[in-house]
Swiss-Prot record:
It comes from Callithrix jacchus. Cilium- and flagellum-associated protein. In the olfactory epithelium, regulates the speed of activation and termination of the odor response and thus contributes to the robustness of olfactory transduction pathways. Required for sperm flagellum assembly and stability. It is found in: Cell projection, Cilium; Cell projection, Cilium, Flagellum. InterPro entries: ARM-like, ARM-type_fold, CFA69, CFA69_ARM_dom. GO terms for cellular component: cytoplasm; non-motile cilium; sperm midpiece. Signal peptide: none annotated. This is Cilia- and flagella-associated protein 69. It comes from the Eukaryota. Keywords: Cell projection, Cilium, Differentiation, Flagellum, Olfaction, Sensory transduction, Spermatogenesis. Gene3D superfamilies: Leucine-rich Repeat Variant. Pfam families: CFA69_ARM_rpt. SUPFAM superfamilies: ARM repeat.
Length: 941
């Protein structure tokens, strides 16, 4: 496996390599180079096995000189690079030389020269050499770490230089025909495979008292720790704790601290937190970090010192996330709190006496890091006393106000804004733990005053160029967002002192005002942060008004209006991901906490069609909202005015509320795995409500105070709420239900009976499991209850069958009616076609016309009385002078008054006639005429 890993890593670097099934390895040769050959860069054959045998020989005269001569010759031969095929033999020679150093010190130079060669490029003759010799190369490089045990400072330093050169590869000095340089990362990969990092970590412990060599080893580890593989190896070798514990060791150059912190940083970044934090969370490591940080904080004035100080603080912050870290025991937590607050709260502590932060970037970052570590420290409850002693809340509240021109530290506007937001965010975590300190600082008053400033339009310009300032550029949304988060955190403590103080200061009215102000100013660019602000306002109002009728009355109609405004949001926006879902949840919560229970608010909500809006959201079939909406509707149904509104609602395709609720019931049962047939009928009359989960769970005896599975089922799904709503709407008078709905309604109607039967069945089964024998009367009672429950199931199943059969009959009747209608339509078309054919025949054939006329006259004659009644008026059927091709039909127009007297239809007559006709008969339209007066006759005298 180890060989395969090495080969795979090498193969990944050299794409297009040929697979080599079998490679015949010959005796490696190296070149003894003449001057001419060296100029050409060609390796001459040299028997490395002979050199190895020579070094293995002992007790011969002049042998040492001969051995040194051959090693020197070898070094000269490979001065341009090491071929991969010869690497195993060369390192074997190196190992033999190292073994002779103890008794023959002259071999130090030979070993030194060979190690120096390892810094040269590795050469390959074939593309596949990197894969073929991967195992040999990895073993050879691993040997370098083992050689660190040789007590030679010069040799150790050279080994470190050689390894560092792996990361700074240089091209070969001369090009050697037939060879090419291995890829630049090949040595690094082979070092990973060979586990070089482990031996180098062990070397740190070995060289504790030898500073120069130790610094070189740390430099090597600094390079090695850039790889995740090496970091994993180093972690197994306990590198983190070993390096961290010696951070504060004396070192005039400062390299030890720099390189150690860099290694720790890489280990934290590239290793799993679960593995590294336990190594660093010990008293020794934290004491070392504490001393280093204090020294850098108090005496570090250079740019480099400040950067290193911040790096140490970041490492400490990560360690502090581990609850097991003894931050309090080592005194580090107390010092960090002091450093975080000494600028805002005066302290006589000698550590900060005379200290002052500048507005440099490093000090600015330090301030943010200190705020951040306070948030982490406050998660450990024993730290609370330190936070109180350090006046952390008071220090943080110095930022909860309008920016001032004169400040302790001359931060830039952008820096101060970011610190202000960071401080308020920190307060959101700290203040809920320190309620007394919060109230003693008049926290509510300060936050509400700050919110008033956030609403005012003034010359303040927000930069919005930080994480906390996101979405707040050119406005005060970021400040408002974090202030509301702080208030929300305090309100949800449900501390009556805090909430009463807020209400007395007019928080409810102020929150409603802020909400109205925000919705009046549409800002699409900052939509996400605006939605978050609205959600927080509604949550604050919910927290304040819950269980308090007087506060609900203060919420009043203005509060209901903002709730209704949110409820009218376009449903398509719920899928936008901007926060509309959260806002809707907050709105539903505010309906529950701020409206329900206050009858004037409930009535106003109903008047404004609030129930319609709730049902509209319910009809969206979003499961995450259903449970909450149904719970709200159950409470609303206690109001007698609600039923009319619910029954009046109509959804898509004229769906009623009852039909919607029954549809939700069916969907819920399908998801729960309740057994029903294709028509929705009960299958198992003994367990009509059983879910698949209940079927899987075996009944086990439980204590009396533990709810059983049947009881828990009531609260874990929406069936009980649907039953309650339909029960309050009256099961007998639900409009707009189909036969399928009625089948389901039969089950819903008996939900409570079925559930009671389930619980009694559980009791009976538990008694059996516990092997208890109830008295005869109790046993009979249990059996009677079980039988009654089953009978109810059978009765409901029978009723469902009747409904289904009745619907089937109704469907058949409807089908027959439709079929009869279709038949009548076809028959009418046939009659119309026949009539049209007769008409065409009469108009095209005179004989047919005469025949039709005779038949008509005959029919008319047959319809008359044979004896004419007395005083009867005879009306002829033929109209003289009528020129038509069609004889008169069966409709006879009778006019007893001549048309000249009628004057046409009366529909067009003027009501105000100028002059009545003098001819009698019906009124007719006459033209207005001017009547001239008759000449007066002279009366004879």
């Amino acid at each position: 496996m180890w060989t395969e890993k090495a080969a795979a890593m090498a193969e990944a670097q050299e794409s297009g390599c040929r697979n080599k099934s079998s490679i015949s390895r010959q005796t490696p040769v190296a070149g003894a180079v003449t001057e001419d050959d060296e100029a050409q860069g060609v390796f001459k054959p040299m028997d490395l096995n002979h050199v190895i045998k020579l070094l293995e020989e002992t007790n011969k005269d002049g042998l040492e000189e001969k051995q040194l001569k051959f090693v020197k010759k070898l070094v000269q031969c490979y001065q341009n690079g090491l071929p991969l095929r010869d690497l195993a033999q060369i390192f074997k020679i190196l190992n033999l030389c190292a073994g002779k150093i103890k008794n023959q010190p002259r071999f130090i130079e030979s070993a030194y020269d060979i190690i120096k060669l390892c810094g040269l490029p590795f050469l390959k003759k074939k593309v596949s050499d990197e894969i073929t010799y991967a195992e040999d190369t990895a073993n050879s490089i691993a040997l370098l770490g083992d050689l660190m045990k040789i007590p030679s400072s010069e040799l150790r330093i050279q080994i470190c230089k050689c390894i560092v050169d792996f990361y700074h590869a240089e091209p070969p000095k001369k090009h050697i025909p037939g060879y090419q340089q291995a890829c630049s990362s090949y040595k690094i990969q082979m070092a990973e495979v060979g586990g070089l990092a482990k031996t180098m970590v062990q070397a740190v412990t070995l060289l504790e008292n030898q500073l120069v060599e130790k610094l070189w080893v740390l430099k090597v580890l600094q390079h090695l720790s850039t790889s995740e593989v090496n970091c994993s190896i180093m972690m197994k070798a306990q590198a983190a704790s070993g390096i961290c514990a010696h951070l504060n060791d004396p070192d005039p150059s400062g390299q030890l601290l720099f390189r150690s912190s860099e290694i720790l940083w890489n280990l934290l970044e590239k290793s799993s937190k679960e593995e590294i934090l336990p190594q660093l969370s010990n008293l020794e490591c934290l004491l070392a970090l504490k001393e280093v940080f204090k020294n850098l904080f108090m005496r570090g004035f250079s740019h480099y010192d400040r950067q290193l100080r911040n790096d140490i603080l970041v490492i400490t912050t990560i360690i502090a996330q581990n609850p097991e870290a003894p931050m309090i025991e080592c005194g580090f937590a107390k010092d960090l709190i002091l450093f975080a607050t000494f600028n805002e709260v005066k302290s006589q502590n000698i550590l900060v006496k005379g200290l002052k932060l500048s507005n440099s970037y490093e000090d600015f970052e330090l301030k943010k890091l200190l705020f951040n570590i306070i948030v982490i420290l406050c998660k450990d409850l024993p730290t609370i006393q330190l936070l109180i002693e350090g006046s952390v809340v008071l220090a943080l509240f110095t930022y909860v106000k309008k920016p001032e021109k004169q400040r302790t530290i001359d931060w830039s506007a952008a820096q101060y804004e970011e610190l202000q937001l960071h401080a308020i965010a920190t307060l959101s975590s700290v203040a809920p733990l320190l309620i007394e300190e919060y109230m003693s600082c008049q926290g509510n008053a300060q936050v509400l005053a700050f919110l008033e400033w956030c609403e005012i339009e003034d010359s303040f310009f927000s930069h919005g160029n930080s994480f906390h300032g996101t979405g707040g550029r050119g406005n005060k949304f970021a400040q408002m967002r974090y202030s509301l988060r702080l208030l929300r955190a305090m309100v949800y403590l449900e501390d009556e002192t805090v909430n009463t103080d807020l209400c007395e200061k007019g928080t409810i009215q102020q929150m409603i005002g802020i909400f109205k102000n925000i919705i009046s100013k549409t800002n699409e660019k900052e939509e996400a942060i605006v939605l978050e602000i609205q959600s927080d306002i509604l949550l604050i109002l919910s927290g304040l008004c819950e269980h308090h009728i007087q506060r609900k009355e203060i919420f009043g109609t203005e509060g209901v209006d903002i709730v209704l405004h949110v409820m009218k949001t376009d449903p398509r926006k719920l899928q936008s991901g901007l926060g509309y879902n959260v806002l809707l949840f907050s709105t539903l919560d505010s309906i529950w906490c701020c409206i329900l229970g206050c009858y004037p608010s409930e009535d106003y909500f109903l008047e404004k069609e609030g129930i319609f809006l709730l049902l509209d959201v319910l009809a969206l079939n979003e499961k995450k909202f259903c449970n909450l909406i149904l719970g709200i509707m159950v409470e609303f149904c206690d109001n007698p005015k609600t039923a009319a509104h619910v029954n009046a609602w109509r959804g898509k395709k004229d769906q009623t509320a009852a039909s919607l609720l029954i549809k939700l019931w069916r969907k819920e049962e399908k998801e729960l795995g309740v057994k029903r047939d294709k028509n929705g009928k009960i299958i198992d009359t003994k367990k009509p409500l059983f879910t698949s989960f209940q079927e899987e769970q075996k009944i086990i005896p439980l204590p009396a105070n533990c709810p059983s599975i049947a009881v828990m089922d009531v609260s874990e799904n929406i069936r009980a709420k649907i039953y309650a709503i339909l029960g309050k709407l009256d099961f007998e008078n639900l409009p707009g239900l189909s036969a399928e709905d009625f089948v389901t309604l039969c089950i819903i109607h008996r939900y409570l009976d079925f559930k009671i039967g389930e619980i009694w069945n559980e009791i009976y089964e538990e008694i059996k499991l516990e092997k208890l024998r109830p008295v005869t009367t109790d046993k009979k009672a249990l059996e009677a209850i079980t039988t009654a429950s089953e009978n109810i199931g059978k009765m409901v199943a029978s009723l469902q069958s009747e409904i289904i059969e009745s619907q089937a009959c109704q469907d058949v009747q409807n089908e027959q009616k439709v079929y009869a209608k279709i038949q009548a339509t076809h028959k009418q078309r046939e009659l119309a076609n026949k009539s049209w054919g007769n008409f065409l025949a009469r108009t095209s054939n005179a004989k047919t016309l005469k025949k039709a006329k005779r038949l008509q006259e005959k029919a008319i004659k047959a319809s008359r009385y044979h004896e004419r009644p007395q005083h009867a008026i005879f009306h002829p059927t033929d109209i003289k002078g009528l020129n038509t091709t069609v004889p008169s039909g069966g409709v006879v127009t009778v006019e007893s008054t001549p048309a000249r007297l009628v004057g046409g239809p009366l529909a067009d007559t003027d009501i105000a006639l100028k002059k009545l006709p003098i001819r009698g008969g019906a009124l007719q339209r006459v033209k207005a005429v001017k009547i001239e007066e008759a000449p007066k006759k002279s009366i004879p005298t």
